[in-house]
Amino acid sequence: MKKLYSGFDLCAPTTSVSMTINGPAPMILAFFMNTAIDQQVEKHLRATGEWESAKRRVDKYFEGRERPCYEGELPPGNDGLGLGLLGVSGDKVVDAETYERIKTETLASVRGTVQADILKEDQAQNTCIFSTEFAMKMMGDVQQYFIDNNVRNYYSVSISGYHIAEAGANPISQLAFTLANGFTIVEYYLARGMDIDSFAPNLSFFFSNGMDPEYTVIGRVARRIWARAMRERYGAGSRSQMLKYHVQTSGRSLHAQEISFNDIRTTLQALYALFDNCNSLHTNAFDEAITTPTEQSVRRAVAIQMIISRELGLNFCENPWQGSFVIDE
């Protein structure tokens, strides 16, 4: 994990990691959090001038044992952050009080998402590693850890409708199943004794956007239903009423013939998502219908978002299709 994220400051506000894992999520999350904490330990040691003495302690720790190392050259712009403590935890090189302080600060600032929604696995993917009951328990354990350690900027689960849509659901069915799964998770966490306002802000959603007209409003409809249910059914506060969602353009809609035209489909779906005020967006590469994306197709997929964001004038006005100032004028 330290090699994987080396050079990326996991506590920087511009770094957000999506952990799209549907099996041993708590184990992988533990590796990730340890990596983030040890990065900050390394930064602390360098900033305080203690790095050389820490290196000597690490050398002594590995005396007579094989030491892990990064193979090959670092990519351009990669400063190797995180590689200094390969094979050793930060609590071995700083005192307990300093480590606990760094750990607390790290957990409060680290950003990302665990996409460990077992319910859509049952409904759409049929790739379950564990039983539904056990997987729900692990999801609850992750959320309880987030509550106990004030992990507020990391989503404990991405409640996913995308895979349901890819399995054949229309937009209305996708939304219905996804919200139902969300409320199921809410009820389960409440049954475990968690407070609604302690965990609801850690929930996020994930929708597909295809070509159907209902996709123009799927986000706002979801937000309206979620906000009213949170307020009126569960008595939740304003932050818990906010539904945050990611959109991925529809992989199912991509054609295997004339694949270059898929960029047109993806652009239209991206407009649906952005004009419906999604929080984040993934645009598919045009060749995903037949192969793993190439560098060229990935650049084109990114360019779709950049051109809409920086050059399309209508996108500069929030909510352009639904009673906005620019349309009224």
Q: Which positions does each model-derived feature cover?
A:
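Catalytic alpha/beta active-site cores
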Residues: 1-209, 214-215, 233, 240-246, ...
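Short glycine/threonine-rich loop-to-helix capping motif typified by GTGT followed
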Residues: 30, 167-176, 210-221, 249-263, ...
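Residue-level signal for the start and early helices of compact helical domains
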Residues: 103-105, 148, 236-238, 266, ...
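Active-site or pore-adjacent capping/gating segments
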Residues: 268, 279-329
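Extended, hydrophobic alpha-helical segments in both membrane/secreted and soluble proteins
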Residues: 182, 205-207, 215-230, 245-250, ...
